[in-house]
Amino acid sequence: MQSVTPTSQYLKALNEGSHQPDDVQKEAVSRLEIIYQELINSTPPAPRTSGLMARVGKLWGKREDTKHTPVRGLYMWGGVGRGKTWLMDLFYQSLPGERKQRLHFHRFMLRVHEELTALQGQTDPLEIIADRFKAETDVLCFDEFFVSDITDAMLLGGLMKALFARGITLVATSNIPPDELYRNGLQRARFLPAIDAIKQHCDVMNVDAGVDYRLRTLTQAHLWLSPLHDETRAQMDKLWLALAGGKRENSPTLEINHRPLATMGVENQTLAVSFTTLCVDARSQHDYIALSRLFHTVMLFDVPVMTRLMESEARRFIALVDEFYERHVKLVVSAEVPLYEIYQGDRLKFEFQRCLSRLQEMQSEEYLKREHLAG
């Protein structure tokens, strides 16, 4: 049976017509293929201890000396819509076995903070966390590597070095090059070791020369789809496939401001979610701010006509649109009626006129070209 590789998956996508030939993507696939082959052909070092002695060592908190040079990884950076996440996923899906992890960088840092809380009072907690990751994986794939929080910045210098020292290979995507991470941040000097570690253990590739596939998809599509019938649902599914790079198979529950938020899909910094979840349930403007930072594209499903009995829902919808607009979030909507018929209430006519104007602008090519403001 022929093995699945990044190259074979890339060629399959071209043959099926789901992606077009792109020289920059082809170069990235070539680099990912090299990493893949080196990982497949490398033999991890044998553990120093096993059985009873290993369990006793762990019980007493002793760590093995597992330092070795990892297979050199890849840090792909560039604007949205360049296919970075799709390329990384080709690589990740090609890797056999379970000793691999693919995480949104925000989720990775949430786990690190949870582990640190549990390890309060321990000496060298970052070393322990690195040990735990090494016990689970040999490859980390980070989507959207971005640092804006001073606490994260202070941790990453030591943590990245510890992960690389244990032979973990990193493949990451980001909107900015390593040298621009945490630019102008407080005490940035303490973050510089993280940048040095990334550049020492990863090739850095700019993918900006390629086609902006997300922009092309959005500019060629209707972004306000109505009415709510089978054809609209099929169009939304087709757009999700193009924007997120896969079918809506996972519907994780997010934690936003310490409260659960049910989704219809999360992938490639794209969120699928219902109007009920965001505007009927009691969500606050702070929730919309958090979502606008996390996702560059939101697909909002099943927006009803907002009558005078839905003024609270309409007010939340206005707040949601305002936050998405300010951070250049791309919004795709399925609705009961066309855009200018969606509000039929009384009290918010003035406010909704401004909202409609923004929604109209958010469908323009000029708006769609704007860079998402995640920070």
Swiss-Prot record:
Keywords (A to Z) from UniProt: ATP-binding, Cell cycle, Cell division, Cytoplasm, Hydrolase, Nucleotide-binding
Cellular component aspect of the GO annotation? cell division site; cytoplasm
Q: Which GO terms describe its biological process?
A: cell division
Q: Which residues form a coiled coil?
A: none
For this UniProt entry, which segments traverse the membrane?
A: none
Q: What happens biologically when this protein's gene is inactivated, per the record?
A: Mutants have no growth defect in aerobic conditions. However, inactivation leads to a stress-dependent elongated phenotype (in anaerobiosis or at temperatures over 37 degrees Celsius).
**GO MF term (any one):** ATP hydrolysis activity
Localization, per the record, is:
Cytoplasm
* Pfam families (alphabetical): AFG1_ATPase
| Residues that hold ATP according to the record | 78-85
InterPro entries referenced in this protein's UniProt entry, alphabetically? ATPase_AFG1-like, P-loop_NTPase, ZapE
Look up the signal peptide feature and give its range: none
NCBIfam families in the record: ZapE
According to the record's subunit comment, the protein's assembly and interactions are: Interacts with FtsZ.
Quote the function comment for this protein: Reduces the stability of FtsZ polymers in the presence of ATP. Required for cell division under low-oxygen conditions. Hydrolyzes ATP but not GTP.
The UniProt entry's sequence similarity note says:
Belongs to the AFG1 ATPase family. ZapE subfamily.
The misc remark on file is: ZapE abundance has to be tightly regulated to allow cell division. Loss or overexpression of ZapE alters Z-ring stability and leads to bacterial filamentation.
Name under which the protein is recorded? Cell division protein ZapE
Provide the species name: Escherichia coli (strain K12)
Gene giving rise to this polypeptide: zapE
